[in-house]
Structures are given as structure tokens and as C-alpha cells.
Amino acid sequence: MRGLRIVGLHVRKHWFIYFAGIGMVATASLLAAQIPRLLGIVTDGLRDGTLDTAKMAQYVGLIILIGIVRVATGWGGRVLVHHKGRELTYNLRKQLFEKWGTLSPSYYHRHSVGDMISHALSDVEVVRELVSQGINQAVSGLAMLLAAAWLMAVHVDWRLTLAGLGPLLLIPLLVKWLGPQIRLQSQRSQEALGAMAQTTEEVIGGIRAVKAFGTEHIVISRFENKVDDIVEEKMRFVRLSSLFGALVPLMVNLGFIFVLGYGGFLLTAKVISLGDFVAFTLYVALLRQPLEQLGNVLNIIQRSIASLNRIDELLRVVPEVLDREGYILDRPLQGTLKVQGLTFRYPGSERAVLHDISFSVGPGQTLGIIGAMGSGKSTLADLLLRLYDPPDGTVSIDGEDILHYPLARLRDGIAYVPQDGFLFSTTVLENIGFSDEYPDRKRAERCAEITAVHENIISFPEKYDTEIGERGVRLSGGQKQRIAIARMIYKDAPFQIMDDSLSAVDTSTERRILRNLLDLARLFPGSAKNPSKATIIISHRLSAVQHADEIVVFADGRIVERGNHTELLSIGGHYAGLWYMQAGITEESDSDGQRDISQPDLDVEMDVLEAGRMEEVL
């Protein structure tokens, strides 16, 4: 039931609008409740012959006036309530989106995209139904029920009123019996819908792999299973909901039968008049719709509680990474990074993935990080971005602990290219200028030239205004990576981090991009904001880091070697072995098993690699 606080806060915030809307809807129902009584008076007048033409015209005019006012107030009240219901829909989706932006990657490892889509679409719509249609029907039905019961008891006969409304006392028992079952089944239906959305997202996102493997029949079968699950859960919900919806009118019909029987007896006994009997019969008939509305409202409430609880559970999730309280440095980053004795393990895990990592990089410098998959390179990038919090005192920027910077300030000072080079389903220009609300076209073109993708872009039908499709599906892998790097350059941040972002680029283009980036790291022409950059290049391709000022070699979460390219080759260790493997060069080993590395050999092999004759084996 905690989820109901969401609705309570919303109604309390807009209490005046809801008060006005509810008042107008209630007024419409109260006016409608007067019509049976007026018809009863007209019936008695016609029977007794006391109703002349003038009075008849008055009653007809009064009934017409009541009808007009009822329609106007009912329409106005419903519009007000529905408008605020739409506003709640907007606010809830905004809150969900903002919450997702604060959550760490570990949350997304535990929850599927489909489930989150179900929250934003299906659950929010169910809540909107509660605060718009639910409130309107509840007020209308309840006002009509109370007004009719009062008029029947006061102007007709209280005993007949009890006979007509007595069966309705069973409705609370129905709510207690079926309510929890409806609520539980609604939650299961929403979860099944989330699972189907996840399957749909995966199949569409991986449609190339599906077609390449010719497994359409397999994914269709899996999708059908998900749909069958939804149908099964929905049918269980429909059976329970329909049972509840059928039993409420049954109670109304029982009341109508009691009224006909007992009312007929009172009429023949001359306890009530014919007009009273007609009015009472009309009241009971009039109550059918509001009682069905109240039954529908109870159904909506049970479904909404399940959705509200799901939304509330998400909104209550506490982000694992937050701005620290106390000493906060809200100032721009300058570009000096130092990592000292960093050991890190993921939350909930006892195994450390990084062990005693130390290095530093300053403005105008480039640090290369290489290592096999799973060696901890990307984890380090996550820590620098504070997607996870590093231990206190292990990572500092400009001489201050990284934890002392606000998250917004920290991430504003870092331009990052992820491994997958993720692009958004918008134009090329908006992807490159993603850090600006209104991207500068000339600046975007200059960044594209630096990453050697400008020539490709101007060949597109709409050039920089070309829509690239979901995740850049209309682009090649190399084009996506180069646009992602251009996006990093466009941001013009003091720190640049590239996480294996050149894997889909050919060697000559890679060499051109890296040469431009090295120049950029030292001086970005026309940039007074950040004249020099501290650049970190993470890669398993050694050609991407060979010109870095310092290279650190990761293995099993540890730094096993460090130095520049020439120094690491002269050591003849892990880096040198990787270099020769990627260059596709083999030599006979000396008798002692050690390879003799001479400077001429190095020069020749570097030329070979630069020419692009290499074979990746990592």
C-alpha cells in the first residue's frame, strides 16, 4: 500500500483543481438524483388530476434545466480531473527517467530493459487510470448512491430503501475476497509484459545475428512462449476481474427484485403511492450504472496498487553512487589525474578486480593502458567516471580526492568513448554535438575531420542531418566509432578517455586519428576553455598506444609493466610479446629461451605494423 503515497502527494499538491473537479462531478450526480423524484411527483399529479398544463411545463422545463447543468458540470469536472491525471503521467515518467540516470550499472545488470519499459508505459498508464477515470467514476457513483439512498429513505420509505440496498452490503466481502487476488494477478501480468518487452528489444536489437544464424524460427518460438505467458496471466486476471464485475450487478439486480416484491406489497397496502413506487423503481434502476462504476473503481484500485508498488519500489532505490556530504569541490577540472594504491572489488563481491594500481597523467600527456580482456581496464574507466566509487584517497584530480567533486562537475570534465561507441537514434550532428543542447555545425565538422569521418558524412543523403537509426544501425562499425570519438572531441573536456574505441577502424585510419588526437592533447586550436587534454587510451591493440607518453600493462587486475613503447620493447616482457604477436612476426629463440631484440629489428617491425600488416590474436 506504500505506493498509494504517490497518488496522495499528487492530489495534495493539486488539491484545489481536484476539489473543483470533484465538486462539479458530484454536483452532476446530485442533480441526476433529483429526476426520479420529479417524475414520481408528476406521476402522482397525473393520477390525481392535480397537474395542469402550466405545472407540467414547469416540471418539464426543470428536468431539461437539470439535464443541461448536469452535462455541463459533469463534463467540466471530468476534464479537470483527466487533465491532472495526464500531468501525473508526465511527472511519473520524468521521475522514472531521472531515477534511471542516477542508478549505477549494477542495477541494470539485475533488471531488464523490458521491465523498465513496462514501468514507464504500462504501470504509469494504470496509475493514470486511477487518478482520472477512477476518481471520476468513484465520485460520480458514490454521490449518486448517497443522494439516491437519502431521497429514497426520506421521501419514499426507509424500509423499502433497506430492501433495495441491503444486498449491496455484500460488496465489501467481495472486495476482501477477490481484491488481493486481482492485485497479485495484475502484478504478475505486468511482470510478464516486461519479460515480453525485453525479448522484443533483444530480438530487434540482434536481428542481424538472428538472420545470420537463420534462427528466426527459434526466436519466434521464444517470443510466442512469452506471449503465451502474458495471455495466460492476463486471462487469469480477466477471469477474476470479470467475476468481480459480474457479481456487483448481481447485487443490484437482487436489490431490484426485492424492491419490486416488497414495493408492490407496500403499494397494494397503500403505504406508498404509485408515484413513490415509480420513483423508487427509477432510483434502483438509476443506481445500476453508479454501482457498476464503483465496482469498476474497486477493480482499478486493485490493479493500480500493484503498479504503484512497482513504481514506488523503483523510486525508493537508493543510488550506490551519490555526491558526498561535507567538503565539496564545485570547481572546473584542470586535467591532472593521480591514482595511488587503488584496489577495488565490486559491491557484493569478495574478489578484487584491481590490485594496487598507481599511475598519473597530466595536461598534454597521453597514457596508454593495454591488457587482455577481463584484466580490469574498463573497470578502471568506470571508477574514473565514478560509475562506482573508488576507495577514499586512491584517485585524485588536481590534487583533491575524486570523491570530493560533485558527480555533475566530475563528469562534465571528462569526455568518454565507451567500447561499443554507443550512438543515439538521431542525426549525425546531434550525436557529435551531444554535449550541447544546440550543436554548432562548424565545430562538429571540425571534430569529424579530426576523426577522419567527415568525408563519409558528407556522402550521406542529408550529410550532417542524416538520421543514423537506432544505435547507429545505418553506419558501419568504423563510422560509429569515429563519430563517437568526434563526440568526445566536441565536448572539449580536460580529460579524454577512450575505452577500446578503435577496434573497428583500419590501421591507416587509426594512425591518422591517433596523430590528430596527440596534437589535440597538447593544443586544441581555438579552444580557450581547455587548451590541453589529459588523454587515456585503453586498448588491446598496441598500435593505438605506442605513441603514448607512458604505457601501463594490465594483467589479472595488476600493473605488470610500465614505460614508453621503446622501453617496454627493450624489456622483452609481456608488452614485447604482444607486439610481435600482433605484428605477425616470429623469430627463432636463443638457446637460453630468450629472444634477442635489437633496435634495427624494432624499427623494421614498427614499420611493418604501421603499414597495416598485422593480425590481431587477442
What residue spans do the PLM features occupy?
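ABC-type nucleotide-binding domain
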Residues: 330-618
